[in-house]
Amino acid sequence: VLAEIEFFNVEADKTTPIQLEMRESKDEIQVIGNFNSENKFKRADNGEETSLLATTGRGYYIVALLGSRQEPTNHAMRDIAAVKKELEDWGRGIVLLFPDEKGYKNFDPKEFGDLPGTITYGLDIDGAIQKEMATAMKLQNANTLPIFLIADTFNRVVFVSQGYTIGLGEQLMKVIHKL
């Protein structure tokens, strides 16, 4: 875990501005876990049950579990819209899943601007993908959404993000540019 510690004084009744620095590894991408690309989900557009691999093809992809009408998800989707062109230029599949049909029906992609055309929406059948994400990535609370992974079809995970994250789109692109 990359961390930075800075000591500073806070005087009574005063604001102390501090620059937040997100540390990042200067090294190459590292495999941080495993996730089965043969996991099945139900496509939202046609109701067909299919696998992540069949949807995205061989190679790297992004898979996420979203909580519709929840601020962390809304923020993440605006971050995704902000890097639409870069994600489309990358050319890989993005699978955005919802825990249930109600969640999908409550989701309106138009709320977030222009999202990448490489997105496939779907439903997580019986919560199997969410459970595997939580177990494989050792997430403390499987119900904290959204959860984003960048993985490949050899089942290697190189990025995970859960809950509220600042600059998710930029973080995804930093990893993608190193692949």
Where are these regions (language model features)?
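Structural microenvironment flanking redox-active thiols in thiol-disulfide oxidoreductases
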Residues: 61, 72-116, 127-133
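Structured interaction patches on ligand/partner-binding surfaces of diverse proteins
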Residues: 2-23
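Thiol-/selenol-based redox modules, centered on thioredoxin-like
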Residues: 18-33, 144-179
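Hydrophobic beta-strand anchors of alpha/beta hydrolase catalytic cores
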Residues: 62-63, 148
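Structural micro-motif
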Residues: 116-120, 135-149
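N-terminal "domain-start" segment that seeds a small globular fold
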Residues: 17-53
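A short beta-strand-turn-helix
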Residues: 38-61, 78-82, 86
